[in-house]
């Protein structure tokens, strides 16, 4: 019976393979045309919408995006302001199109995030820090991500912060560890570059030798396997040799690229750029034994076909069918040779992905599910024990796909350093289906065993050590508690509340579970979605037990330093103090603070001002005036209570029901009653919104050899003026200056004139000129701004209109009150309607008309 079933399944698989072959033949003739057209589009740096659309419509994976972005960057030399803005826009588009929860373990995705932050550092270093933090949170396992962030902080003069980043990367187990150790050593030696070119080469060579020795023993059971090889093989080996975790999802993505770049020329390191080669660079291109490291066959120039079916113990034959137990996936991989290759650079390798029909693909998946029990690869018993012990120690299944079905993938341990620290690497022993991405994407997480994270465009693995309980059910009397990002499958089912254990590496999933809840001081809140993130915090939209909407801000304190802790404590204190005095301050309803986390239950807004400005192509003058008045009232409130915000920017204001409210007092400073300014130990704030007096002057204002900067309420006026300037002209006053040193000099230079292009609203232009005066003594104050004609929304005409309307109503009622007959009232009302519809008001003629009507009666 089993033999008959096996034969039936073999016939079914053969028929599916024939369908795949037919589809491939159908698209085969289109390969060259697609390649030429795609090259033509990619070469055009002025408009890449065609390539972008093709990437998003086909695979939409990080490799394709990275290839396109590197090509654009190569063609954007020398880098001008316009090209920089275009590059940043493309990188931003790529990040928005790639969900971090899906690609957080992908090297190309990590490089896109890092490079985007580096480009932002060239344009706006103050904003770049947030993007470096985002890259570090999304892709924490890659050492080069942490080093790039540390390099940026070092370039900003924050040596202590740079060292903290590297040390935390070591604690997190980022790979390769040797790269982090070299960076730390160079930092201690006070070198400007954390990694030099020579160190990169030495690091690459030593890592290769160590990895080869380690893998020779670990992969002994694979020595008899013959594998086909593709152009990505060297990249896969390089990633393998760096000891990086490569989940099956990442592997699957890597072999279905429609754009691919094999080699990349070494480029100079601009502002903050970490001198780390791409792992597929020539420096990392190493020769390894094909019997030890699996690879995939490149498609020959003669277009000979090679099916990625691996038969253990025998060489692959030309026959398209094979034994069912040896089948891993059904696919036709075909790649193209590089168009041009030399020692310095190579062109893009164009590969055409074949897209199956939905019906065929779903049928293929169904048949593969039916035959999964026959496809389980044989794994040595010693390795099986190693996987089991590893999974038990971690308490979390890092590969739910491997447990949900029986396509297990060996997890190989590699020694990282002399302290016996280990990292794991998952390498598929069979090829991965190019035509069937849902196999890995749909089964990478098991929805039944994962408490999903509400997220829209959020961090992948950052908030992994939550301590606050999260309820799995909708407000039960006694319920099991977990973390908002936990995976409940690893916990025992109990009736009591179970808290998450420390130091868990939990995977974040983007979609939200409808019954996921958070507990704050015993109150249960049901999470709807994630609405924001930044640094070590995230914001969720939640429902309380009365079905009222709130926002809960979560702050992870495990990586926070003392300054960060103080900033959050100040924020809570300021919110509690100020929300009682103004409705322009965001409301804080409840909070919970521990050594590991902070939860703040706050008023839920619609969108922050920064995001709103980016989405709006043009701003209505009335909206701008209304929001400006809201900002003035909010800042006036904090100034009345002796608080200078010192870091005002659009992101600090939240739109709530059409009203702007001030949020985020993280770095606010409370002034003493007898002082008019605050001397700060370090420069804070955003450069584009930073007042001249807040910029450090190394030649003056020194105390004990340490530079100081002064801030006052007038400093917030400058920042508000920059925000209003942005709302008026679509940019900040000094945004066009890319070089940060030049920008700082321009801000404090009285000879540098700020442009105020003519606008119809002359009172608005006057407000901008009064706010953006470099001398704080000459700068306008908040009370004066509140009394400025621009803020007075046509007070006098409105009063006159109201007065006129009152007189009109009195006149109409006076005319109607003397009429007794319904017909007379109807005629009088009709006459009044005709008069007012024609734009007329009551006058002598209308009075005579009514008098005549009344006389007739």
From Swiss-Prot:
Phylogenetic lineage: Eukaryota, Metazoa, Chordata, Craniata, Vertebrata
The entry's keywords: Acetylation, ATP-binding, Kinase, Nucleotide-binding, Phosphoprotein, Serine/threonine-protein kinase, Transferase, Tyrosine-protein kinase
Annotated segments matching region Disordered: 371-410, 836-857
Composition bias type Low complexity, residue spans: 836-847
Ligand binding (ATP): 531-539, 553
Protein name: Dual specificity protein kinase TTK
Modes of activity regulation: Inhibited by the ATP-competitive kinase inhibitor, SP600125.
Catalysed reaction equations from the record: L-seryl-[protein] + ATP = O-phospho-L-seryl-[protein] + ADP + H(+); L-threonyl-[protein] + ATP = O-phospho-L-threonyl-[protein] + ADP + H(+); L-tyrosyl-[protein] + ATP = O-phospho-L-tyrosyl-[protein] + ADP + H(+)
Self-association and partners: Interacts with TPR; the interactions occurs in a microtubule-independent manner. Interacts with MAD1L1 and MAD2L1.
EC number(s) on file: 2.7.12.1
PANTHER family hit by this protein: DUAL SPECIFICITY PROTEIN KINASE TTK, MIXED LINEAGE PROTEIN KINASE
Compositional bias (Polar residues): 395-407
Family matches, as PROSITE patterns: PROTEIN_KINASE_ATP (PS00107), PROTEIN_KINASE_DOM (PS50011), PROTEIN_KINASE_ST (PS00108)
Any one GO biological process: female meiosis chromosome segregation
PTM sites of type Phosphoserine: 7, 37, 80, 281, 317, 321, 363, 393, 436, 455, 821
């Amino acid at each position: 019976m089993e033999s008959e079933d096996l034969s039936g399944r073999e016939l079914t698989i053969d028929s599916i393979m024939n369908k795949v072959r037919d589809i491939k033949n159908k698209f085969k003739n289109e390969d060259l045309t697609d390649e030429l057209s795609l090259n033509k589009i990619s070469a055009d740096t002025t408009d890449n919408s065609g390539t972008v659309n093709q990437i998003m419509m086909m695979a939409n994976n990080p490799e394709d995006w990275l290839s396109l972005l590197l090509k654009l960057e190569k063609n954007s030399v020398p880098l001008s302001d316009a090209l920089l803005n275009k590059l940043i826009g493309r990188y931003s588009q790529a990040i928005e199109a790639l969900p971090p929860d899906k690609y957080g373990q992908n090297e190309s995705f990590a490089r896109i995030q890092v490079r985007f932050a580096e480009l932002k550092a060239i344009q706006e270093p103050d904003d770049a820090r947030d993007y470096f933090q985002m890259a570090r949170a999304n892709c924490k396992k890659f050492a080069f991500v942490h080093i790039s962030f540390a390099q940026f902080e070092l370039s900003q003069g924050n040596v202590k912060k740079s060292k903290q980043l590297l040390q935390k990367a070591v604690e997190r187990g980022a790979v390769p560890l040797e790269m982090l150790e070299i960076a730390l050593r160079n930092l201690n030696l006070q070198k400007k570059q954390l990694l030099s070119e020579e160190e990169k080469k030495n690091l690459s060579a030593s890592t290769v030798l160590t990895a080869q020795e380690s893998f020779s023993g670990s992969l002994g059971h694979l020595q008899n396997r013959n594998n086909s090889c593709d152009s990505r093989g060297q990249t896969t080996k390089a990633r393998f040799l760096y000891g990086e975790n490569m989940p099956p999802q990442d592997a699957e993505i890597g072999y279905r690229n429609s754009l691919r770049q094999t080699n990349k020329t070494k480029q100079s390191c601009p502002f903050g750029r970490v001198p780390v080669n791409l792992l597929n660079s020539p420096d990392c291109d190493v020769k390894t034994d094909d019997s030890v490291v699996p690879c995939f066959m490149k498609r020959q120039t003669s277009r000979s076909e090679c099916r990625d079916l691996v038969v253990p113990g025998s060489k692959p034959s030309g026959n398209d069918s094979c034994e069912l137990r040896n089948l891993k996936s059904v696919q036709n991989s075909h790649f193209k040779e590089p168009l041009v290759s030399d020692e310095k650079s190579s062109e893009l390798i164009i590969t055409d992905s074949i897209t199956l029909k939905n019906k065929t693909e779903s049928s293929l998946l169904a048949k593969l599910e039916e035959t999964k029990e026959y496809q389980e690869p044989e794994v040595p018993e010693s390795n099986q024990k190693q996987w089991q012990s590893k999974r038990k120690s971690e308490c979390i299944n890092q590969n739910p796909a491997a447990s949900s079905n029986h396509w297990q993938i060996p997890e190989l341990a590699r020694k990282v350093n002399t302290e016996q620290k280990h990292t794991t690497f998952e390498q598929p022993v069979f090829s991965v289906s190019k035509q069937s991405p849902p196999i890995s994407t749909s089964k990478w997480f098991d929805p039944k065993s994962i408490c999903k994270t509400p997220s829209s465009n959020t961090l992948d693995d950052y908030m992994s050590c939550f301590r606050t309980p999260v309820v799995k059910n909708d407000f039960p009397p006694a319920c099991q508690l977990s973390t908002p990002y936990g995976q409940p499958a690893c916990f025992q089912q109990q009736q009591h509340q179970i808290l998450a254990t420390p130091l868990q590496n939990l995977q974040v999933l983007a979609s939200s579970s409808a019954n996921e809840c958070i507990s704050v001081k015993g109150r249960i809140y049901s999470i709807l979605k994630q609405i924001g993130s930044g640094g070590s915090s995230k914001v969720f939209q939640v429902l309380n037990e009365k079905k009222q909407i709130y926002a809960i801000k979560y702050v992870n304190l495990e990586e926070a330093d003392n300054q960060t802790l103080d900033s959050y404590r100040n924020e809570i204190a300021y919110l509690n103090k100020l929300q009682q005095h103004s409705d322009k301050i965001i409301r804080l309803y409840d909070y919970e603070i521990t050594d590991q986390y902070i939860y703040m239950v706050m008023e839920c807004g619609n969108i922050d001002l920064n995001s709103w400005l980016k989405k709006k192509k043009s701003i209505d003058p009335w909206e701008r005036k209304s929001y400006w008045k809201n900002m003035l009232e909010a800042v006036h409130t904090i100034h009345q209570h002796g608080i200078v915000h010192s870091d005002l920017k659009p992101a600090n204001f939240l739109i709530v029901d059409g009203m702007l409210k001030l949020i985020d007092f993280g770095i606010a400073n409370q002034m003493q009653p007898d002082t008019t300014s605050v001397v700060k130990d370090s420069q804070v704030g955003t450069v584009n919104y930073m007042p001249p007096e807040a910029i450090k002057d190394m030649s003056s204002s020194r105390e004990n050899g340490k530079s100081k900067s002064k801030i006052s309420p007038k400093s917030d006026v400058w920042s508000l003026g920059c925000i209003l300037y942005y709302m008026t002209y679509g940019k900040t006053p000094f945004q066009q200056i890319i070089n940060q040193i030049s920008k700082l000099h321009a801000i404090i230079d009285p000879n540098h004139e700020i442009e105020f292009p003519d606008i119809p609203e002359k009172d608005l232009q006057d407000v901008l000129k009064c706010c953006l005066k470099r001398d704080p003594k000459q700068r306008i104050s908040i009370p004066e701004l509140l009394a400025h004609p621009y803020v007075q929304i046509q007070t006098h005409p409105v009063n006159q209109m109201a007065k006129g309307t009152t007189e009109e109503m009195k006149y109409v009622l006076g005319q109607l009150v003397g009429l007794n007959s319904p017909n007379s009232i109807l005629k009088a009302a009709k006459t009044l309607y005709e008069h007012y519809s024609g734009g007329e008001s009551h006058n002598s003629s209308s009075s005579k008309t009514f008098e005549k009507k009344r006389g007739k009666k």
